[in-house]
Amino acid sequence: MATTTTSWEELLGSKNWDTILDPLDQSLRELILRCGDFCQATYDAFVNDQNSKYCGASRYGKSSFFDKVMLENASDYEVVNFLYATARVSLPEGLLLQSQSRDSWDRESNWFGYIAVTSDERSKALGRREIYIALRGTSRNYEWVNVLGARPTSADPLLHGPEQDGSGGVVEGTTFDSDSEDEEGCKVMLGWLTIYTSNHPESKFTKLSLRSQLLAKIKELLLKYKDEKPSIVLTGHSLGATEAVLAAYDIAENGSSDDVPVTAIVFGCPQVGNKEFRDEVMSHKNLKILHVRNTIDLLTRYPGGLLGYVDIGINFVIDTKKSPFLSDSRNPGDWHNLQAMLHVVAGWNGKKGEFKLMVKRSIALVNKSCEFLKAECLVPGSWWVEKNKGLIKNEDGEWVLAPVEEEPVPEF
């Protein structure tokens, strides 16, 4: 295996990943996989059983989070904040899950991801402090995209800081039929912006919008680590990828100084905004976006050019058909599957190169939430499940749904 010396600035896109995507630099491969594993952790920890009073929360607490999701080198990273999003502003049902229990932990909000930093020991070894933000995609399958409005709307809320009332800038009463009459100017998809900027005064967890939570914590962390050469990496898959792109731009525009690198490494990202928004993103020299996309993934082409949307950032196009371990699936959900993409990244040697795993990564991970592996791999489909579907036997001999590891607590 050829060894290269690539600076951390280059890995974060200081040169737009020129010359290190093809052939794929080994350190960049490892960074992409790490970000993908951070994304996967948001799925693995999310309680999606609507019978549970904790549906929509994180199953694991911050202190043991990375251990419980079995992250490689878990001790190198610490979760410092959980993030929450709400559906207050005309968000279609199905994107944020609600518990059917009358004792639900919160009826207006869902856990939406986390902020993590490198540990003191890891930071000392690196000579700098890394800040990671992982935003959760939807736990629903492919059909979620059909219920989310694709209309573009003004990106003006992102051009200045959040409102004093805790909202991110989109006013109450905004609907998915809303559209700006002005066809010019910087625009993003209303659905993506709504999730990012909504707050709900009746919720203890989203009195501040996802946007306001993020900017407040990033400001605090940048001050705390100002002498440790901090960098910010955002990551997300699918819906989470769109929010990571918006948040990366927002942090570069409103939440950090020009000398702090802000990088989004996203997977299977639908289109976010128009050409003018892309120009705004590119105007920030410290802001870089790398989009890992499967060439046959249909969702990365949504909402589409007819509505004025364009690709944003540098595309790193891979092809799941190159892996000899994956079946010839006709399921678009498989083409969009995060673990399948990470599997291909692990063995990617260019469009013309032969697939060969370049890091130690179990192929069984592909089938965590799907059945994309060939039958001869002998790996059951959708194997990441709670024992007994989360039921435990209590002291009275009753089988009941287990509580989460730590009771959710508002953090802002």
Curated annotation (Swiss-Prot):
Induction: Strongly induced in response to sublethal levels of UV-B radiation. Down-regulated as the leaves senesce. GO terms for biological process: cellular response to UV-B; lipid catabolic process; UV protection. It is found in: Cytoplasm. Expressed in leaves, stems, flowers and siliques, and, at low levels, in seeds and roots (at protein level). GO terms for cellular component: cytoplasm; cytosol. The modification N-acetylalanine is found at residue 2. The active site is at residues 238, 297, 336. Keywords: Acetylation, Cytoplasm, Hydrolase, Lipid degradation, Lipid metabolism. Pfam families: Lipase_3. Disruption phenotype: Enhanced tolerance to UV-B stress but not osmotic stress. Impaired PR-1 accumulation in response to UV-B. Its EC number is 3.1.1.-. The keyword Metal-binding does not apply. It comes from the Eukaryota. GO terms for molecular function: phospholipase A1 activity. Belongs to the AB hydrolase superfamily. Lipase family. Acylhydrolase that catalyzes the hydrolysis of phosphatidylcholine (PC) at the sn-1 position. High activity toward PC, medium activity toward monogalactosyldiacylglycerol (MGDG) and low activity toward triacylglycerol (TAG). Confers sensitivity to UV-B radiation probably by deesterifying membrane phospholipids. This is Phospholipase A1-IIdelta.
